[in-house]
């Protein structure tokens, strides 16, 4: 093979009248008899090749035999296109290469789908032929953007005194949250390693070892139910520091994100980011990861309706609940009763019993509950509605109200076109509760993880009322997605012991699960804290995708399997025998895991 002159996508006017050698894939071929055009594709783009008897008769014959996705090498001379043939949509659109030599480096079967953006093909097929899917320009762009982000992260953290340290991939199973992926030990029959759900404990130990500032682009593994922005194996930008306050860690993180946004998107984000307490986020936006690209704040009308004749509202308040509302500007004419009822059915999944609504006119109100509120003037004023608006109400327990209205706010924000899809709005959510109640397993769990330091003024509550304590934790949110989270950690063994006790750990169980950390805390650990940012989610948001599978080279599908390699699949009996493992076919995985610990977010 000859040495490549440049990438096909880089052949521009500066190469005119120069001899070039190019290599790549045949995107498409067009034959006009004595003239053949081939679009040659590589990672940088596409350039048009021209074959003619005038240039070389043999090259024309070979060009006539090639098909899509053949791998070829060509030599030729770059020429300017005729004005009427210029393609302004292509970087190389004002030139073409007159080819005199072509070599077929490899043939290709007809692909199961066209290698082009926007192709209509099932997700399963794209994953089965991922190596073909990754040839598409938008997929290449996603992976290059990911690499660009990682490069920017490395540069910033290296320049700010952080040291890149690898932590173990084979480690001990600890009750950190989701189910562990277990790896059986052949050397120790019946014993297992676990793949890390995060480097959390190891990075704390590195602070105890005196490294002061650690980072890692860390691979993490969690055996949990999947959704669009989750994968069983994922990557996070992991940081930990010693002797810094939460505010100082947030400042460093803002600097990191500002550099990435500048380097990758050419955007200078406004610093510092907005800060909102967890309680305000839930009250105003119905979410602990609020989308601040639009306003539409939730309004509390509990006091106004507690004595109303509408028993649903009055009863909710009397039973310790709330009545809250959102206003949909211009929604009165846009949404019919049928459309509103469809949302009423949807919010029942959050525990809401129903959705009340009013339409505002110039001098009155209408709707199923209008008769209970006269002309509705006080109610309209309280929620800040105007003529033509639609007001939605939910009455229930605080969490149910927040979850339901938070969903409705986001849904209608998109539907009404209130969200600038090109905007990036970062914010911090701070002052979290230390614990939250998990209705699914009917017990208290950490809002983040069991190594989070309570607020200084709340440490004493670990002895008396731990569930009232707040934490030195903070989440960074982008456009309604949790981008990352962190906290100041517990560096005192006594406080860590109280935290585990509040979670129901006996001293013996705490020592068995976290003994190595508890023992280490006896040897002079510094105050420390950190943060982790989900790299996959960050790339997804910066590339405008809606699924992290689009920004991971070889992801799993929604069933945690990989169609390309067929993983996971049964292994040979001999391998199982070496490990002392017997496979049972009658296991119900859900029942097997009932009562599992859930200690993290």
UniProtKB/Swiss-Prot annotation:
Disulfide bonds: none annotated. L-aspartate binds at residues 176, 222, 448, 489. Coiled coil: none annotated. PROSITE patterns: AA_TRNA_LIGASE_II. Its EC number is 6.1.1.12. Pfam families: GAD, tRNA-synt_2, tRNA_anti-codon. It is an enzyme of class 6 (ligase). It comes from the Bacteria. GO terms for biological process: aspartyl-tRNA aminoacylation. Belongs to the class-II aminoacyl-tRNA synthetase family. Type 1 subfamily. PANTHER family: ASPARTATE--TRNA LIGASE, MITOCHONDRIAL (PTHR22594:SF5), ASPARTYL/LYSYL-TRNA SYNTHETASE (PTHR22594). This is Aspartate--tRNA ligase.
């Amino acid at each position: 093979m000859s040495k490549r002159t440049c990438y096909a996508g880089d052949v521009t006017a500066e190469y005119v009248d120069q001899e070039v050698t190019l290599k790549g894939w045949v995107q498409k071929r067009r034959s006009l008899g004595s003239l053949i055009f081939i679009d040659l594709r590589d990672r940088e783009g596409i350039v048009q090749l021209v074959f003619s008897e005038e240039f070389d008769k043999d090259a024309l014959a070979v060009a006539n035999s090639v098909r899509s996705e053949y791998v070829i090498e060509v030599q030729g001379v770059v020429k300017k296109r005729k004005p009427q043939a210029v393609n302004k949509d292509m970087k190389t659109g004002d030139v073409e290469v007159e080819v005199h030599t072509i070599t077929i480096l490899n043939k290709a079967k007809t692909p199961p789908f066209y290698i082009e953006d926007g192709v209509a093909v099932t997700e399963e097929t794209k994953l089965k032929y991922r190596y073909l899917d990754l040839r598409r320009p938008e997929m290449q762009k996603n992976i290059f953007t990911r690499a660009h982000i990682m490069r920017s992260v490395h540069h910033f953290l290296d320049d700010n005194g952080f040291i890149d340290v690898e932590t173990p991939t084979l480690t001990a199973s600890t009750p950190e949250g989701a189910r562990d992926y277990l790896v059986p030990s052949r050397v120790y029959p019946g014993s297992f390693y676990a793949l890390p759900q995060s480097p959390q404990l190891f990075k704390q130990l590195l602070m105890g070892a005196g490294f002061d500032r650690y980072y890692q682009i860390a691979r993490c593994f969690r055996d949990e139910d999947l959704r669009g922005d989750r994968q069983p194996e994922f990557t996070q930008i992991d940081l930990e520091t010693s002797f810094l306050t939460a505010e100082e860690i947030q400042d460093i993180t803002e600097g990191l994100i500002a550099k990435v946004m500048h380097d990758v998107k050419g955007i200078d984000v406004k610093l510092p980011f907005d800060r909102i307490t967890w309680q305000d986020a839930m009250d105003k936006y119905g979410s602990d990861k609020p989308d601040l690209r639009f306003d539409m704040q939730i309004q509390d009308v509990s006091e106004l309706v507690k004595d109303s004749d509408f028993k649903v509202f009055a009863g909710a308040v009397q039973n310790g609940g709330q009545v809250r509302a959102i206003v949909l500007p211009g929604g009165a004419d846009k949404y019919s009763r049928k459309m509103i009822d469809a949302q009423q059915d949807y919010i029942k999944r959050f525990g809401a019993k129903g959705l009340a609504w009013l339409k505002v006119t110039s001098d009155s109100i209408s709707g199923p509950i209008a008769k209970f509120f006269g002309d509705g003037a006080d109610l309209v004023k309280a929620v800040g509605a105007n003529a033509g608006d639609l007001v939605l109400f939910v009455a229930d327990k605080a969490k149910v109200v927040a979850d339901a209205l938070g969903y409705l706010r986001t849904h209608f924000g998109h539907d009404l076109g209130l969200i600038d899809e090109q905007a990036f709005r970062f914010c911090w959510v701070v002052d979290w509760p230390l614990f939250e109640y998990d209705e699914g397993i009917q017990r208290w769990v950490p809002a983040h993880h069991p190594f989070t330091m309570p607020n200084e003024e709340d440490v004493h509550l670990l002895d008396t009322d731990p569930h009232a304590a707040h934490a030195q934790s903070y989440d960074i949110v982008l456009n309604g997605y949790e981008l990352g989270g962190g906290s100041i950690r517990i560096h005192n063994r006594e406080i860590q012991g109280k935290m585990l006790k509040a979670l129901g750990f006996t001293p013996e169980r705490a020592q068995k699960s976290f003994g190595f950390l508890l023992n280490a805390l006896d040897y002079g650990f510094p105050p420390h804290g950190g943060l982790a940012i989900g790299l996959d989610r960050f790339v997804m948001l910066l590339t405008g995708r809606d699924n992290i599978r689009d920004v991971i080279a070889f992801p799993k599908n929604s069933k945690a399997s990989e169609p390309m390699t067929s993983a996971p699949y049964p292994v040979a009996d001999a391998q199982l025998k070496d490990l002392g493992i017997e496979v049972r076919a009658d296991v119900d995985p859900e029942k097997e895991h009932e009562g599992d610990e859930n200690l993290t977010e």
